[in-house]
From Swiss-Prot:
Similarity comment: Belongs to the TatA/E family.
Topology within the bilayer: Single-pass membrane protein
Provenance organism: Campylobacter concisus (strain 13826)
Protein name: Sec-independent protein translocase protein TatA
Family matches, as HAMAP family: TatA_E
């Protein structure tokens, strides 16, 4: 009762075609696909940089602890 049936989806599709026109829908889908592809590419580009920064910070923190320990000893 709460989910969409095939009839509901056909009505939604008909409304979309009426609003945008049959020629405009493929262009919109193509633009959406390019946007998603660009977003994923940017996410993959930034991921290695962040992990390198985290590793560098961890190494810095570890080296500082070692220096403090040797100074106190």
């Amino acid at each position: 009762m709460g989910s969409f049936s095939i009839g509901h989806w056909l009505i939604v599709l008909a409304i979309i075609v009426l609003l945008f026109g049959a020629k405009k829908i493929p262009e919109l889908a193509k633009g959406l696909g390019k946007g998603i592809k660009t977003f994923k590419a940017e996410m993959e580009d930034t991921t290695p940089e962040k992990s390198e920064k985290v590793e560098h910070k961890e190494e810095s923190a570890t080296s500082q602890k070692i220096e403090e320990t040797t100074k106190n000893a």
